Amino acid sequence: MVSTGWSNVTPWKTFREAPEPELAKRLEAMIPANANMSRMVFNFHCPPYGSNLDEAPEIDQDLNVKEAGRSMVPVGSTAVRDAIRRYQPLLSLHGHIHEGKGTARIGKTLAINAGSLYEQGVLQGALVELDPKKGIKSYTLTTG
């Protein structure tokens, strides 16, 4: 498993944000050269750009949500997307974008964002059953 809490730059300017080229270098440095990608899990906080796991409400220059949250835009990371496309791990797990609950396929890789409803006091998660021979046996998104 390769894990990181780093993300691409956001309007919120939080700790552990990096421009896409720097994030790409960080990811490359963490991924072992001879790793067995058929058993590899990427646990990257930021979801891949354009995957539908990264759809968030569009905001204006004053950080206010536009159109009452009806206008959604992709805000994930191109560096994360490119790493998944290049290495094709078995599974990639993501968070960061609370509205991005769901799954996506990027090549052979199953990507999951469990989403978040923490402001409502609701825990969301993903249960993934792995089989040493078959890879991903099953998965379920949970709310509770």
Q: Where do the language-model regions lie?
A:
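Conserved catalytic scaffold of divalent metal-dependent phosphoesterases
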Residues: 1-72
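Active-site metal-binding loops of divalent metal-dependent hydrolases
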Residues: 4-8, 46, 95-97, 115-117, ...
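Short intrinsically disordered, low-complexity coil segments enriched in acidic
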Residues: 1-4, 81, 91
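Binuclear metal-dependent phosphoesterase catalytic core
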Residues: 18, 81-87, 99-144
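Short amphipathic alpha-helical segments and helix-helix/interface helices
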Residues: 28-32, 77-84
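Generic alpha-helix detector with strongest preference for long hydrophobic helices that associate
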Residues: 61-65, 73-74, 92, 109-111, ...
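Active-site neighborhood of phospho(di)ester-bond hydrolases with catalytic His/Asp-centered motifs
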Residues: 41-45, 74-75, 84-99, 112-115
